[in-house]
Amino acid sequence: MLAVYPGSFDPITLGHLDIIERGARLFSEVIVAIAHNPQKKALFSVGQRIKQVQAATSHLKNVRVDTFDGLTVEYARSQRARVLLRGLRVLSDFEYELQMSHTNKSLWPEIETVFLTTSNEYSFLSSSLVKEIARFGGNVRHLVPANVAKDLEACFTQTPIPSQRPLE
């Protein structure tokens, strides 16, 4: 059975990779589908994210990387996938993902959403958090694949960190 794991992956984290690896054990094939959303200001281009995810998942023979525009459920239908794979960290993730699952089901009754809870060590992790840490020069090597850590370091050593006002 084919599953689609959609997201922006800006950047991919070890939490994402954990879900991908576990999904790859459950499904015959997993498509990591990188959403192109022109409304969001991404740190990395879609092309960079494709390369990052491909490098991070190269050890998984039943995982492929693709991009899409538009509705996730329509992308899944175009790929003949009947399962959306989603990761859950906290209760608020579940509330949002449940709403999205019902919405997707209303758009295409054949689609199912499979939720995997994140492993404990990644329950706090998000791409936004990683970018914030990297932006201020913090170490992110334990949060993202090695290739992504290098990309983040290169990105933020070229971009000056805004100065903060001294504490009074």
From Swiss-Prot:
NCBIfam families given in the database record? coaD_prev_kdtB, cyt_tran_rel
Record-listed ATP binding positions: 8-9, 16, 87-89, 97, 122-128
Q: Where is this site: Transition state stabilizer?
A: 16
Catalysed reactions, semicolon-separated: (R)-4'-phosphopantetheine + ATP + H(+) = 3'-dephospho-CoA + diphosphate
Q: What is its EC number?
A: 2.7.7.3
The cofactors it requires, by name, are: Mg(2+)
Biological process according to GO: coenzyme A biosynthetic process
Binding of substrate, residues: 8, 40, 72, 86
Q: Which GO terms describe its cellular component?
A: cytoplasm
Gene3D superfamilies reported in the protein's UniProt record: HUPs (3.40.50.620)
Q: Under what name is this protein listed?
A: Phosphopantetheine adenylyltransferase
Gene coding for it: coaD
Against HAMAP family, the record matches this protein to: PPAT_bact
CDD domains, per database record: PPAT
Write out the function statement from the record: Reversibly transfers an adenylyl group from ATP to 4'-phosphopantetheine, yielding dephospho-CoA (dPCoA) and pyrophosphate.
- Which family does the similarity line name? Belongs to the bacterial CoaD family.
Q: Which residues form a coiled coil?
A: none
Q: Which UniProt keywords apply?
A: ATP-binding, Coenzyme A biosynthesis, Cytoplasm, Magnesium, Nucleotide-binding, Nucleotidyltransferase, Transferase
Read off the InterPro entries from this record. Cyt_trans-like (IPR004821), PPAT (IPR001980), Rossmann-like_a/b/a_fold (IPR014729)
Q: In which pathway does it act?
A: Cofactor biosynthesis; coenzyme A biosynthesis; CoA from (R)-pantothenate: step 4/5
* Compartments in which it is found: Cytoplasm
Give the multimer and partner information.
Homohexamer.
Q: Name one GO molecular function term.
A: pantetheine-phosphate adenylyltransferase activity
